[in-house]
């Protein structure tokens, strides 16, 4: 079991670094796997899980390592570029947590039997809230981005769209 716990720690660090250095220019929040699906009802399904009440109470790497992560709150002054960065970070966070869930399956080799199954289930359930939070916030960020793009078009500025 100790080897599985060490493995979880190692892949956590490796995937964190990967998430920081991976190119973000190919991330499209409107395309698979990040796009919104019909069952999500534009994020309403996550609101029914009360994500808006608990999302700020889970540990967040942007608060733990603020010098390595972009701020995840918009504040009162923001622009299209800020929202774009937040969308990229949102998709990256979801991707990393899904990759952690998949890579975590290796713990079943390190800790065979029911102990490994329970350990993996806990690991998966530990990553699931972060995936849900990203999927809850993405529709709001996309709507905000679209409003800002429309504002830029009305101003006559050049707008870059995915």
Functional labels for PLM-detected ranges:
Residues 2-31, 35-44:
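N-terminal signal-anchor transmembrane alpha helix
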Residues 7-12, 107, 116-127:
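Hydrophobic core segments of alpha-helical transmembrane domains in multi-pass membrane proteins
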Residues 10-14, 66, 70, 94-104:
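Hydrophobic alpha-helical transmembrane segments of multi-pass integral membrane proteins
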Residues 11-15, 19, 100, 126, ...:
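Alpha-helical transmembrane segments of multipass membrane proteins
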Residues 19-33, 130-145:
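Inner-leaflet juxtamembrane helices
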Residues 26-86, 143, 147-162:
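Membrane-proximal soluble regions of multi-pass membrane proteins
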Residues 83-115:
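Transmembrane alpha-helical segments and their cytosolic interface motifs
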